[in-house]
């Protein structure tokens, strides 16, 4: 038991040291790059709810490399590197692969895990839950309900009212402020 604790302590210390390093710019896109990436993606829509089915080759052509790696290859971005980790504007978070609404900003909280965390999805159908037994762990993977992009995982150690912690890779999230979302809603309605 003592040996296990020593190994765990060393591993945690090494992880903390590597996580504190600055992230590479390749993981972050400025808003201009993100907008042009959205324009190249024919399935990206914040209003269309139809299911998206594409081959991996098609996804590879339309998604930025960092989004493709996490969304389609079930990768994980480095903790504490997401621009949404310490981001608290009011609005809605969307799937970066297809534009599906995922979370309201009111459900975001600081879990200390290094990734954006939420306690409740925007709707029941916005997230798909899949058993994940990789890496010697038993977890529940979260996928986008529209395009099945890998988002992250959900754990049962979150705050009230749900007790859930949706630990999401920020690179697979897009964000629109409440004002932007309201404007698009009004334009769509007219």
Whereabouts are the PLM-identified features?
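Short, contiguous pre-domain boundary segments
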Residues: 34-55
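Low-complexity, intrinsically disordered short peptide segments enriched in small/polar/basic residues
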Residues: 4-7, 49, 124
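A short Gly-Trp-Pro
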Residues: 51, 60-94, 100-190
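Short hydrophobic/aromatic-rich motifs at helix boundaries and adjacent loops
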Residues: 27-30, 40, 136
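Bacterial Sec-dependent N-terminal signal peptides
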Residues: 1-31
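Polybasic, lysine/arginine-rich low-complexity segments
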Residues: 28, 34-35, 189
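Acidic, low-complexity intrinsically disordered regions
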Residues: 10-13, 55, 76, 111
């Amino acid at each position: 038991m003592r040996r296990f604790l020593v190994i765990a302590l060393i591993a945690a210390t090494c992880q903390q040291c590597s996580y504190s390093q600055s992230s590479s710019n390749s993981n972050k896109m400025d808003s201009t790059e993100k907008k042009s990436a959205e324009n190249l993606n024919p399935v990206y829509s914040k209003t269309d709810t139809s299911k998206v089915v594409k081959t991996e080759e098609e996804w590879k052509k339309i998604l930025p490399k960092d989004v493709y790696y996490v969304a389609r290859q079930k990768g994980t971005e480095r903790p504490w590197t997401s621009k949404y980790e310490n981001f608290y504007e009011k609005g809605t978070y969307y799937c970066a692969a297809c534009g599906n609404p995922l979370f309201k900003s009111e459900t975001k909280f600081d879990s200390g895990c290094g990734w954006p965390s939420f306690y409740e999805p925007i709707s029941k159908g916005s997230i798909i839950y899949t058993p994940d037994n990789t890496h010697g762990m038993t977890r529940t993977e979260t996928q986008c309900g529209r395009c099945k992009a890998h988002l992250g995982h959900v754990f049962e150690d979150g705050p009230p009212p749900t007790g859930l912690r949706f630990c999401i890779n920020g690179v697979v999230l897009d964000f629109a402020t409440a004002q932007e979302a309201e404007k698009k809603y009004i334009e769509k309605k007219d």
